Amino acid sequence: MTPVRQEETPHRRPLSPEAEAALGVLRTAALLGGEVAEELKPHGLTPTQYNVLRILRGAGDAGLCRYEVGERLIQPGPDVTRLLDRLEASGLTARARDPEDRRQVRARITPAGLARLAELDGVLDALHRRQLGHLGAPQLRALTDLLAAARVR
């Protein structure tokens, strides 16, 4: 991957440094995200479904309510319920009423969901090494720090 430069995106007027940086982030996200989607496709998952499974794995046995899952998504979407429906139909998640608060329904990852993630952990680690392995540790740390700083406004 090469950095996005002004000359790659012909415009009538020059881009501001902020616009050039934003465009670079968007193009890079599209490239990396497309490659992730291609890796997940043979495993029957979309990137958002994979993200939900990772979120639920991180939640442990307690699981999470629908709105908590939605708050943690990389790309929040309006229909977390439908996402959870699909994952539950595939046997990768299960939902049950919260015994402490019967108004709440908690989603949990199933053993099949954990097994699917275990299959994918190595696959995606290898992909991320192919995507960004050409950057050294100091560059990766700097990139991570800059992206985190860009999210804080």
Regions found by a protein language model. Give the residues of each.
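Short, charged, intrinsically disordered terminal tails
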Residues: C65, R151-R153
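Charged, amphipathic alpha-helical coiled-coil/dimerization segments
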Residues: V4, D85-A148
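Short amphipathic alpha-helical segments with heptad-repeat character
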Residues: A22, L26, A30, I74, ...
